[in-house]
Swiss-Prot record:
Gene Ontology CC, one term: Nebenkern
Domain of life: Eukaryota
Family classification: Belongs to the peptidase S1C family.
Assembly mode: Interacts with th/DIAP1 (via BIR 2 domain).
The gene coding this protein: HtrA2
The name this protein goes by in its record: Serine protease HTRA2, mitochondrial
């Protein structure tokens, strides 16, 4: 198209252009003495724009060489400008507006992520071959609730692990050893203390005002991947502990479809105001996870603070004399129904048991062959219907536990030797 335009312009200029103008240095080409003359013959104009008599002129070819690129450049600029106006693209201003309007999750994370911490449980008996440091036996999450280093997490993240030490890594990468201050095994809550000040603190909201369908964000370190964010909605605000087979707890859990997996335990479940409204606690299957309501957590924190003012730590819960190294969940009829509907290879005849949610690396359960997802149905020939039955089996004092499990559709037997605390 551009070449055709040039050809048309060249023909037009040949036909209608005026005679060549030239400037005279001494005299005109045909005797003109006024300094400016005309030359009707283009043949007297050579390729160097210089004639025999020393006159320099501008032919129609010079005009083309100047005018065509200039015209095409102006035309291209005009077309680009018109296209930018007509093309339905999102401008930077419009994009930023849409992002501000719809990326509310990012705003939540920006406001509270600095207070979330990564918790590692280090095995002081085993050391990494290359670094010489204690290996990580398990991990979890937590969040800062006081500027002077007080951290909230789940009890199962930090207790019942002999010969271990607790280490906390902040969002900025700094790492500190931690001491366990308060523990409530019944509610599965604990606090840690690290020796550092001026930390970012997580705001605590109200779980009593939550509604089903409300957006929430789960923060933590699933599978040791720190600073991980997942989002979902509140599926239920009143999931009773009895429905989950937790007979020793009187808690109405928050149920959410936000992804909570290994390592998320102890991390915050926050609302769109960036306030913690729960503590991530457990997962049954994809889309079904539970958190401890923050109103219940506040009661634990008030009691713990009162104990600290009196000079003693707040430690309650059923004693576990021996350590196996698993996190478990009772399979209630409702949970069994959900599992069977989501898992194709689960036998329809299964009516009871305890789901192994997490196995701590290096623990007796890990050494004995238990795996996450196993369902414990019998221990030492006794039926296991809830998690309390497992604690009773540990308290029997037998050296070994003969455990019958269901792994997929296959029934298996494993032998575990629990450790003394």
């Amino acid at each position: 198209m551009a070449l055709r335009s040039i050809n048309k312009l060249e023909v037009f200029l040949k036909r209608y252009s005026a005679p060549t103008l030239y400037y005279c240095s001494n005299k005109s080409a045909h005797g003109a003495t006024n300094g400016i003359g005309t030359d009707d013959s283009n043949n007297n104009y050579n390729n160097n724009n210089k004639n025999k008599n020393g006159y320099t002129g501008f032919s129609w070819r010079s005009v083309i060489r100047f005018f065509v690129p200039f015209s095409l450049g102006a035309l291209a600029s005009t077309m680009v400008a018109q296209r930018e106006e007509l093309t339905p693209t999102i401008s930077a201003r419009a994009l930023s507006g849409r992002r501000r309007e719809f990326n509310f999750i990012a705003d939540v994370v920006a406001g509270c992520a600095d207070s979330v911490v990564y918790i590692e449980i280090k095995d002081t008996r085993h050391f990494d071959y290359f670094s010489g440091q204690p290996i990580t036996a398990s991990n979890g999450s937590g969040f800062v609730i006081e500027q002077n280093g007080l951290i909230l997490t789940n009890a199962h993240v930090v207790i019942n692990k002999p010969n271990t030490m607790v280490q906390v890594r902040l969002s900025d990468g700094r790492t500190f050893p931690a001491t366990i201050e308060d523990v409530d095994q019944t509610s599965d809550l604990a606090t840690l203390r690290i020796q550092v000040n001026n930390l970012s603190v997580m705001k605590l909201g109200k779980s009593s005002t939550l509604r089903s369908g409300e957006w929430v964000v789960a923060l933590g370190s699933p599978l040791a991947l720190s600073n991980t964010v997942t989002a979902g909605v509140i599926s239920s605000t009143q999931r009773a502990s009895q429905e989950l087979g937790l007979r020793n707890r009187d808690i109405n859990y928050l149920q959410t479809d936000a992804a909570i997996t290994f390592g998320n335990s102890g991390g915050p479940l926050v609302n769109l105001d960036g306030e913690a409204i729960g503590v991530n606690s457990m997962k049954v299957t994809a889309g079904i996870s539970f958190a401890i309501p923050i109103d219940y957590v506040k009661v634990f924190l008030e009691r713990a603070a009162a104990r600290r003012r009196k000079g003693s730590a707040y430690k309650t819960g059923y004693p576990v004399k021996r350590y196996m190294g698993i996190t478990m969940l009772t399979l209630t009829p409702d949970i069994l129904f959900e599992l069977k509907s989501r898992t194709q290879n689960m036998p329809n005849t299964l009516s009871h048991g305890v789901l192994v949610w997490k196995v701590i690396v290096g623990s007796p359960a890990h050494s004995g062959g238990l795996q996450p997802g196993d369902i414990v149905t019998h221990i030492n020939k006794k039926e296991i219907k809830n998690s309390s039955d497992v604690y009773d089996a540990l308290a029997d004092g037998k050296k070994e536990l003969d455990i019958v499990i269901l792994r997929g559709v296959k029934q298996m037997r494993v032998t575990i030797t629990p450790e003394d605390p």
